[in-house]
Amino acid sequence: MKLHELRPAEGSKKAPKRVGRGNGSGLGKTAGKGHKGQNARSGGGVRPGFEGGQMPLYRRLPKRGFTNIFAKEYVEVNVSRLNIFEDGTEVTPEVLKANGVISKVKDGVKILGNGTLEKKLTIKATKFTKGAVEKIESIGGKAEVI
């Protein structure tokens, strides 16, 4: 098989439905829309969520909660991801971004305790979990809140 011999799988491609192009096509005259009525008109049809006049589900369910506009969004990094650094490295949010561990700093970096840490590092972050601090300090590293 060569690249110019590649074909789509049998039955995976359908010819487009050409409506309103003569009665011989089977989709002429009313173009599959029937006679008159809301759905036959241009722009016809009901809005999404309309249930025929019955009180729709999105209005039957109660509103709940709110979005706290002061909520802080931290980028979470597990200690296992920090093994890419050399022993004795000072790891800061800027260093994490430069090495592709995180893409954005947002409101800060939170270090989580999932996985194992094999390198002795000085880690500076906005927040740490208890488990993360234990793992960092158990091998002689430092966890500093910035």
Swiss-Prot record:
SUPFAM superfamilies for the chain: Ribosomal proteins L15p and L18e (SSF52080)
Disulfide bond positions: none
Keywords, alphabetical: Ribonucleoprotein, Ribosomal protein, RNA-binding, rRNA-binding
Residue stretches of biased makeup (Gly residues): 21-31, 42-52
GO cellular component: cytosolic large ribosomal subunit
GO biological process: translation
Record Pfam families: Ribosomal_L27A
Keyword rRNA-binding (UniProt): yes
This protein's record includes keyword Ribonucleoprotein: yes
MF term (GO), any: rRNA binding
Region feature (Disordered): 1-54
Composition bias type Basic and acidic residues, residue spans: 1-13
Family: Belongs to the universal ribosomal protein uL15 family.
Biological function: Binds to the 23S rRNA.
HAMAP family: Ribosomal_uL15 (MF_01341)
Record note on quaternary structure: Part of the 50S ribosomal subunit.
Name used for this protein in its record: Large ribosomal subunit protein uL15
Protein source organism: Clostridium novyi (strain NT)
